[in-house]
Amino acid sequence: AEGSPELPPASLIVTTGGTGPAPRDVTPEAIENVCQKMLPGFGEEMRRASLLDGVPTAILSRQTAGVCGNALVITLPGKPAAVRVCLDAVFPAVPYCIDLIGGAYLEGNEAAVKVFRPKKKK
């Protein structure tokens, strides 16, 4: 809008819902159409965490992630409890992934989550 300051580009886009097998669940297909690279390891880890949390239907989920420009796009399930399990599982890798794809440098709050960063070579 005219007179509005320009917003910086997003480095992380998170969606919730639309990742199941029902006909209306099309979120994974939508991001596959706009992302340049898909990161299937995110979905694999989210399903693993959900299975370990005692959710046998986690195998029906189609969560995934992809790279869209310099942004990481992550699809999450629609249920709030499942969102928590899935975010807890993948978030340690998010700041480093965003750094690798040229997005903003994100700091982590060590009290909340241990963020992974590779050790620098000396």
Predicted regions and their residues:
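Non-catalytic beta/alpha edge segments that cap or flank active sites
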Residues: 1-122
